[in-house]
């Protein structure tokens, strides 16, 4: 009985310690999710409204470039998910969805990374060109368009940083659910393997 009561008390103490440790992370997590929403929305708005007309070279829109279209879609999806995850975070049964949120946080971070890479490559080529394939830079003619695209990519990168931090926090929350094996359980398993009776203190 003493052994059982001791293990129960230890488990309760460990659970209480987890709650104390997780509390600051909950606040940080909520803050990051709230910050990610305006960053992603601003990135979408800056890119989706981006166009410029030049008398000599015509009109250029974000939709003309696949990398920019991809960035808009990914940021829109990320913003919607951020709002949904904020609503889930306010519910008491959030622990039921810890694994789902962990997976979606990881996926959002990877998608934001790929969209930032794709859009940044387009911006770089627009600013610097590519001499190997005889592509000239175009930002000297479409400076406002390039500037808005750069701002959108920067906002996307800021949202990415939020989700990188969220990925770490959600991973911490998920994996702290697993308790390390107690000393009594380890002794019992070792005794069973050796064929010896277990003596409880």
Curated annotation (Swiss-Prot):
Residue stretches spanning the membrane: 27-47, 71-91, 99-119, 149-169
Region spans: Disordered: 180-201
Membrane topology summary: Multi-pass membrane protein
Residue spans, topological domain Cytoplasmic: 1-26, 92-98, 170-201
Keyword GTP-binding belongs to the record: no
InterPro entries in the cross-refs: CASP/CASPL, CASP_dom
Record-linked PANTHER family: CASP-LIKE PROTEIN 2C1-RELATED, CASP-LIKE PROTEIN 4A4
Entry keywords, A to Z: Cell membrane, Membrane, Transmembrane, Transmembrane helix
Extracellular side: 48-70, 120-148
Recorded superkingdom: Eukaryota
Family: Belongs to the Casparian strip membrane proteins (CASP) family.
Protein name: CASP-like protein 2D1
Biased composition (Polar residues): 180-194
Pfam families: CASP_dom
Compartments, record wording: Cell membrane
GO CC annotation: plasma membrane
Assembly description: Homodimer and heterodimers.
